[in-house]
Amino acid sequence: MNPIVVREYEKIGIKGASKTDIDKNKFNKLKEFIKTNKLDEDPKFFEVYKDYIIPQNFIGSINIDNISIEIFPKIPLVKDNENHKKERFLEILEYVETFNENIYENLEIGNENMPILEFFISNFIEEVEKIVKKGLVYSYINKSENILYFKGKLDLPNHIKYNIIENRFFMNFDEFSINSMENCLLKLALEKIKNISSNIENTDKIHKLLIQFEDIETSGLNPVHLFKKILYNKKNEFYKKSLNLAKFFLLDESPYSIFFNDKREVTGVFFPMETIYESYIANKLKQLINKQISIKIQDDS
């Protein structure tokens, strides 16, 4: 089904209340989603009325059951050319840190009507497939275990605590493992989008990829902490684009996007317009003026 496309400040409502109509059941789910996530508060992304809502201050996509509502800027991205508005929208996003690639060039013929959220999921899947084809990176993981043999360094305090009678050794050692931070983050992202995507092709690919990550342990891991520890080098540089996209899905609130999931019935991806245009204009200025001049985007203070 083709997405429903509206611009900022255009009404979305039940039949007869707006130019863009959805059925009453989906409209009520959307209102509940907005209220639950406080999207009608600060920052105010919606004005909510009895029979219609008005999206504002953001661009993005909302999926309700089997339909997708896409919100584009109030100002036209391409003059008198509706067919290329998504392409221009994605071109703007490439100037945002998370999407600092030519993502709009990946908008293949036949995918023009793919919802934005599914498009990002598809891009992430494609990057992970490249990594699997090249080979998952291994790294040394520090472990502390109570084992039957000497390996590494004896952890004497824990050895005394746990092994007064048992014929074991509490050892601290490094193990060359597939449970690298990079692989753990990719698996966490795959597990999350598995519960979000409604595109049959995407979900099929996700399940196939998760088989490749079956031996990777992610229980109890905090993606926020893992991302802070990631350092790129020649060994893992090819993970960078996929991890940027994984961050978009896993951290829910990055500086440039807000992502919500409500029991899979309603999902939304939102890009605050103020932040998007600040980043876009700053990067355009860098291209136009002397590269020796430093340009910084203002912070929230």
Which residue stretches match the model-derived regions?
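Terminal, charged accessory segments of proteins
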Residues: 1-228, 238-259
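Acidic-basic catalytic patches of nuclease active cores, encompassing PD-(D/E)XK
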Residues: 16-41, 268-300
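Solvent-exposed, charged helical/coil patches
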Residues: 227-284, 289
